[in-house]
């Protein structure tokens, strides 16, 4: 039960998870370290938000400014001994895809922005007495970005790779499929070279910090073939800003992107095994709306979500899991001078995971 149900839970948690606080597109889970034996997985997903707002007392609409996108991740885990497990994970920790439609009359019509990243995380778990274990690892993260505003401002960064770490601890009670893990992901600061076009092309440089975060993941059996599971994720988003010097000068010191509040995302749900081949999970997610306004390149604030997942044990060593997620995106008012009102927005996410034990 433990292996099948936790797999279903992970996909339910991650399908469309990118709509959580800030620009994150990965929950940075350490769950792969607890898979049995030698294990490999491939995950692919997509999220299709519908985000629009208005100005002029609702008379001018932005149109859908949040195009859909896809994500992927790869993972491999093996035991080096009865006390040591190692894993490597490739994922996309942060990302953004903004595209205000042209011809709407909205102040940012035709503006676009992208943020992309890739990361490789190598982790190790060392088992201690009494079902405790410690976790540690290193992360290499590559990031870049590009923006083009309707005002004529453009900016493109270099691709930069920098490094961070993950540390944590876990406790298990296999008899009831119980597990709790607490992990800390360090911040990673990227020093970008950039080309800005304010009044002509200008080479510049600036630093952006991908923020630190803390993950609490848990599960426990509550009845035969039934698990209660969930997570709490805190992200220090006030560490994150995009502040190219040319843009700062033209805007009077206002960053291109920043966040005035940190985020805490919650998930809670139930998983159940129906038979030796099929299991499923139902998960709920929540991130509260924060006070104040939001950036015009990210006009969302908090969310509520529901996810469904099903897992099929195709053979003794292959399992396939699919999940769908509906997200009710929180209302937001964007920063002055635009002051766009974004409400009644939502999105759908879906993901598929193939896991192989060998």
Language-model features, listed with the residues they occupy:
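Hydrophobic alpha-helical segments, especially transmembrane helices
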Residues: 3-4, 273
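Residue-level marker of intrinsically disordered, low-complexity segments enriched
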Residues: 2, 8-9, 126, 354
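Outer-membrane beta-barrel porins/channels
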Residues: 21-22, 52-60, 70-73, 79-358
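Beta-barrel outer-membrane channel/assembly domains of diderm bacteria
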Residues: 16, 20-68, 73, 77-82
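Outer-membrane beta-barrel biogenesis signature
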Residues: 4-44, 175-177, 187-188, 278, ...
